[in-house]
Curated annotation (Swiss-Prot):
Subunit structure: PSII is composed of 1 copy each of membrane proteins PsbA, PsbB, PsbC, PsbD, PsbE, PsbF, PsbH, PsbI, PsbJ, PsbK, PsbL, PsbM, PsbT, PsbX, PsbY, PsbZ, Psb30/Ycf12, at least 3 peripheral proteins of the oxygen-evolving complex and a large number of cofactors. It forms dimeric complexes.
Gene transcribed to yield this protein: psbK
Keyword Lipid metabolism: no
Family label: Belongs to the PsbK family.
Gene Ontology CC, one term: chloroplast thylakoid membrane
Taxonomic superkingdom: Eukaryota
Primary location: plastid
Subcellular compartments: Plastid, Chloroplast thylakoid membrane
Role this protein plays: One of the components of the core complex of photosystem II (PSII). PSII is a light-driven water:plastoquinone oxidoreductase that uses light energy to abstract electrons from H(2)O, generating O(2) and a proton gradient subsequently used for ATP formation. It consists of a core antenna complex that captures photons, and an electron transfer chain that converts photonic excitation into a charge separation.
Protein species of origin: Phalaenopsis aphrodite subsp. formosana (Moth orchid)
TM helices/strands, residue ranges: 32-52
HAMAP family for the chain: PSII_PsbK
GO BP terms: photosynthesis
Protein name: Photosystem II reaction center protein K
Length: 61
């Protein structure tokens, strides 16, 4: 349990304190991927919502 907590803390610290993480831009050769990359963080939320819709369709068995 403590090891998992330490790993989560390390990951959070590395993402929160690296300023290049939030402001990084793609190279010009890959600029056409920008719209796809803007949508990618939403995809896991859609799968989460799909699970509820699926359970509602089968009446929460």
């Amino acid at each position: 349990m403590l090891n998992i907590f330490c790993l989560i803390c390390i990951c959070l610290n590395s993402t929160l304190y690296s300023s290049s993480f939030f402001f990084a831009k793609l190279p010009e050769a890959y600029a056409f991927f920008n719209p796809i990359i803007d949508v990618m963080p939403i995809i896991p939320v859609l799968f989460f919502l799909l699970a509820f819709v699926w359970q509602a369709a089968v009446s929460f068995r």
